[in-house]
Amino acid sequence: MPIDITSNESKNAMKNEEIINNKVHLENTNNNPNNNNNNNNPNNNESLLIAEATIQEEDLKIIVNEIRFKDQLRNKGFGEVFDNEFILNSLETLYLLSNNKLKLFGKKEYNFSSFLKILLKKDKKILTKYLIFRDLRSKGYVVKEGFGFGTDFRIYERGEHGKKPSKYVSIGINEGLNIKSKDFVNTVDQIEKMGKDTVIAVIERRGEVIYYKTIKMSFFENKKKS
């Protein structure tokens, strides 16, 4: 499936340097026969108790208070500690609600649909982000918010979160979306300067996520000798 990332006004930005997208298969780490430690599987929902969290409706902050819930969520790659509070981000909360592994309480109890409805008012891209987040988590990866490029995530392979920096940064794009090549190249350059590989996550109209890895190639002017 081709991705139209060029426009007439920005083709010159890629005259001598091209970013080429190659389809890449992200390994499903849940099926790795060498991994015998099911307790470290971030998608092993059978071993995950139903956690409880509270929501502050004014800022949508999701807080987990009980130590037993904090420990089990942390072991599965969910949540971060900020100002001595254990916080779940919106996508983690949606994912856990969708798998019936979280009870969320505020002025009322929220389920997946009611929480998503609130998030859509704040972030029109939340569903795009969630589809990518869900797909990566289902493959066994730990997924964290990115660096502010839009729909981007840091991707950690099993057992690496908290021990090693993320190797990949994923950028989400909806199928059929036209983006300027100059902006695209600038984003990839910034990610590359961080020492990370860029993975483009394209969401097809049916909801399937296809991944492309970017490769930078330089082209030199081919002059004929007189």
Where are these regions (language model features)?
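Long Lys/Arg-rich low-complexity intrinsically disordered regions in nucleic-acid-associated proteins
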Residues: 1-226
